[in-house]
Structures are given as structure tokens and as C-alpha cells.
Amino acid sequence: MISIRLKDGSQREYPEGISLLQVAEDISPKLAKNAMAAVFNGKISDLNSQVKEDGCLELLDFEDERAREVYRHSSAHVMAQAVKRLWPESKLAIGPAIDKGFYYDFDSGHTFTPEDFAAIEEEMKRIIKADYPIVRKELSREEALQFFSERSEDYKLELIEDLPEDAVISTYQQGEFVDLCAGPHLPSTGRLKAIKVMSLAGAYWRGSERNPMLQRVYATSFPKKSMLDDYLQKLEEAKKRDHRRLGRELGLFVVLDEGPGFPFFLPKGMVLRNELENFWREEHRKAGYQEIRTPIILSRELWERSGHWDHYKDNMYFTTIDEGDYAIKPMNCPGGLLVYKQNLHSYKELPLRMGEMGLVHRHEMSGVLHGLMRVRAFTQDDAHIFMLPEQIIDEIKGVMDLVDRFYSLFGFPYHVELSTKPEKAMGSDEIWEVATNALIKALEERGMEYKVNEGDGAFYGPKIDFHLQDSLDRTWQCGTIQLDFQMPEKFDLTYVGEDGGKHRPVMIHRVIYGSIERFIGILTEHFGGAFPLWLAPVQVRVLPITQRSQDYARQVVAELEQAGIRVEADFRSEKIGYKIREGQLQKIPYLLVLGDREAEEGTVSVRHRKEGDLGAKLLEEFKQTIVKEIKDKVL
């Protein structure tokens, strides 16, 4: 008998060789029905896996990201099986799960079109209905090469050849279909429910232009049709909220052919941007930060010293000045380090917090540029904190508090991810371990749950990333906290300690918005262009019904402007219904309709963007209400 400890701490005895699915069924048939994979002794496994030793078991359902990956990876195999049935000459490349779905790359003589989607979906449904068991089999390298050679699956052969000599090679079979795969997978194809083929794209094999162009078929899947319907509805809503369209329609920003990747901000967009920057400055002033500004162009020697030249050169822009090599900064940190070095610092001054709204430039391939979300020039709300080693935990927690204040203001829930040492990194393993443990301790002391991203840290240190969730349930990585022991060493940063000697400070790099441009893009789609009152470029539009009420309209505009409210008036000779509809399309928070009665009584007829007609109010009453709403930054 073997002993299995469950997540709730309880323990059960089972005969050796029982499958994880059988264990789940013994615990609860409903639990087994919803389970998609399991973690046994820390390793994610198929539910069909047999248990041969004591261990700890956690069953995963669709709510768990790891289970969603298994579900959609199995979905990709079903789609590949369907394509092979419909177009047998198609060769298989790769088919991973991705965020919100999956894809499979094919080398096929058939050119896929959207008209093929229905046929692929129908064949997938037949495979799902057949409920084929999904069976794992391990092979020797020779067996695997022979198997896929007989089937002329050239891409699979290349993958096998590139595996390490000691790699475990496995296949998964469902019905007649067999694929090279490490797994894990669902117990059977019948576990899949709602599927939808979404789109097509071209993709070079292994991402290299030197390799063949493959056809990539994107799709998604969910365990319930209602979940798929909800996802598709949100996709449609996302199209309506596309920040590129809204940016132009609302007069916020544009990206022109004359400057690909370099956005133009229009007057209303600058109002929005300035409000965000003003709020940033005020909150950072209250949190003890000093603001600096560093040059956009700095010498090659500086970038070599910082390590950016070696690690980031392909993403940088360069120029020559007085026969010397210079680079346009892709990051603000080296400039901040030079500012620190301008003075001798005592331990009594630390922590020293310096913030910068710094314009940076990064070379991005034209194919990945996307409105404000992916650009070549953007403003980072960078800050660098220089501190004593014993201040690390408190400073990290202080940044977390600031991040929470910002994201809560906009109504963004968020989750946290910890990224550890990447393959290409500066510094020793020991320093990386100290830095990583400091971030973990700060997270745990603040009681924050977090996910670990192995190997995804910056080249100079581990980091905490903040992923906010918008109104369409999409996640965006914006804020980050990076702990750095490397740069202070490279730039010979020091402070005078209590003992009178020179010591090395520790450094935090952090952003909250991340990129002002990208954050504005996210806000535009999150609110669908209907920004909170305090952010709205135009907060009130005054709509006189007739020429007789225009003088009163000018008086209302003047009073509201005097109170610091952003107001404009529409004096055109259009019908009032037309003016109201246009104001609604422009997503202006308050429309004030003014006729003869309002002029006589000193009132305004108020229409709210969400609540509709609020009736007549005294101008002074309305003014006080809106001033308070702006001051309180109401959502």
C-alpha cells in the first residue's frame, strides 16, 4: 500500500499502481470529473499516471492556470488530428497552449482559409465525441526517429535530434493520431467541450526567416459553452474598445506613417496624459521621492559600463557626435546612477528615492508595433531607490503600497509574479540568491500570493511584476520592482557608513505605470474611452438650446472654468437631440442642457453619461458636486 497526502492535509491509503484519476474518483466523483491534471510530489502529471510511491497530491481544475494549459494543449492535439484527417499530407510542427487558447503550425499543400474553420471544428467535435483515451508512451531515441521517419514527419525528427542525449522521449496517442509530446494531457478527448477555431497566421519554423514558412491555426477551448460565449463576447467588445480607433475618434492620439512606432498626442490626449503625470508627481512627492531628469542621448562608454551594450544593443538606436559613439537611451537607470554619484552620501540620507518621467527609445520590429501598446518611443515612470541592506524589505513593501494605491484608483485588480535569474545574467549565484530571497520575504511579510517565473528576471537582478486585470478580463504587466546589487558595483556607488568608511548601497529599480503611453492605451480600452471624471479631457459640455440661451451658456462656462473644471460649449445651430447624441458619442461625463427656463432660474439641466437625465440643479449646487467628484477621483 502507498500513502497519499491531499491538499487539505488528510491522508489516504491505496494499492500501489493506482492511477491519479482513480484516486480522484475515490475522493469525489465530482472532483474527478472537474480535474484535468494533478501535481504529485511537486510534478505536474497526467491523471492517467500510476502512483508507485508515497506522496502529496493536488488535483487541478480549469480555474488553475496549469490545468488550463493542459486542457488547451490537449485541444491542440485534437485540432492537429482533425487537420490530418481532412488534409492527410499536412506535416505537423508544434502546437502549444497560449494565453486564452492554443495554436498548431502545419506545413501543408492546402492553403488554409477561414472557410475551412467550420470543417475543422466539425471534425474536432467528432474526435471529442469518440472520447478516445489519450495514452502516453515512452520511446528510445531510435524508436522515436524510426516512428516519425516512417510517417515523414520531418519537423518532429528535427525536434528529436535536438533533444539532449539523456532526454525522456514520449508520444501521446488518441485514436489513430500520435504526436511527439512531453505532456501532460487530459485522460481522454471526451473531456473537451466547447471549441472554436479563431484565426490564421504565417509563422517561420522556429521563428527564423531562414526556415520554411508554416501555416498557424489559432483556436480556443473551454469546459463550458457559456464560458466560450462569454470569451467571444468580450473579444467583440474589445474590438469596439480598440484604443487605436477610440484614440482617433476622441481626439486623443494617432500613430502616423511618417513616424511608425512614434505616437502623436493630440490636445485632448495631452490633458489625459498630464493628469496621469500630475497624479504620479503628487503621490511620489508624498512618498518621499525627488524628481530628476536625465539626457536622452548618452555615450557608448556609459552603456558599456552598465551592461546594456552587451545585453540590449539590438534594441538600441545610435548616433555619432564629435566623432564619438552615442546611444539614445533605452532605459533610464544609468542616468539615475550618474545623478547619485554627483554627491557624497551619508548613511543618514538613505533611503534616497529619485523618480523620473524619462523618455526612452527601443527598436522594435515593425510587425510587432501596435498603437500605444507596442511603440518605439515611450515615457517610463522610473524611480530608483538607493538604500542600506537592512532597509531592503521595508522599501520593497513601500513600493508595493504605492502600486496598490495607483491600481486601486483605476479599479484594477492585479496579481504578482516573481521572476528569477535568467540564462544571461550579471553577477554571482550567491548575490542572485540574496536578492531573490529579499523579494520573497517582502512578498510574504505583506501577505501577497505570487507565482514564480523561473529565469525571467532582468539581466541585473530578480524582479516582482504586477499584472493588472482590465474590464475585459485581460491581464497587462505594468508595474515592476527590480532589486539590483550589480549596478552599484559597476558604477562604484558608495555611501559613508556609521563607521566613517565607504560602503556599497543596494538599489531598487521600479515603475508603476510602466509606460505612460501603454497605460493610456490600457485605460482607453478598460473604460471604453469613458474615462473617470477627473481624467476626462472634457468634463462638462454646455448645450444651449437656442440663441437666446447662449449668453447664459457663456456665463455657465465662465463659472465652471473659474472652478477649475474642463468645460466647453456647443454653440452650433443644431437640434438639441443631435448635440446630446454627439456629446454621448464623445463620452463626455456631464452634458448641461440650457434653455429659457434654466437661464431665468439660474439652473442647469444635467445629463450624466451613465445615469442619464438627472433633472434641473442650481448651478452652484452642480459646481460643488462636480468639484468634489473630481477632487475625490471617483471612478
Curated annotation (Swiss-Prot):
InterPro entries: aa-tRNA-synt_IIb (IPR002314), aa-tRNA-synth_II (IPR006195), aa-tRNA-synth_II/BPL/LPL (IPR045864), Anticodon-bd (IPR004154), Anticodon-bd_dom_sf (IPR036621), Beta-grasp_dom_sf (IPR012675), TGS (IPR004095), TGS-like (IPR012676). GO terms for biological process: threonyl-tRNA aminoacylation. Residues 1-61 form the TGS domain. It is an enzyme of class 6 (ligase). GO terms for cellular component: cytoplasm. Keywords: Aminoacyl-tRNA synthetase, ATP-binding, Cytoplasm, Ligase, Metal-binding, Nucleotide-binding, Protein biosynthesis, RNA-binding, tRNA-binding, Zinc. It holds the Pfam family HGTP_anticodon. It comes from the Bacteria. Binds 1 zinc ion per subunit. It is found in: Cytoplasm. The keyword tRNA processing does not apply. The gene is thrS. CDD domains: TGS_ThrRS, ThrRS_anticodon, ThrRS_core. This is Threonine--tRNA ligase. Zn(2+) binds at residues 333, 384, 509. Homodimer. It catalyses: tRNA(Thr) + L-threonine + ATP = L-threonyl-tRNA(Thr) + AMP + diphosphate + H(+). Residues 242-532 are annotated as: Catalytic. Belongs to the class-II aminoacyl-tRNA synthetase family. GO terms for molecular function: ATP binding; catalytic activity, acting on a protein; metal ion binding; threonine-tRNA ligase activity; transferase activity; tRNA binding. Catalyzes the attachment of threonine to tRNA(Thr) in a two-step reaction: L-threonine is first activated by ATP to form Thr-AMP and then transferred to the acceptor end of tRNA(Thr). Also edits incorrectly charged L-seryl-tRNA(Thr).
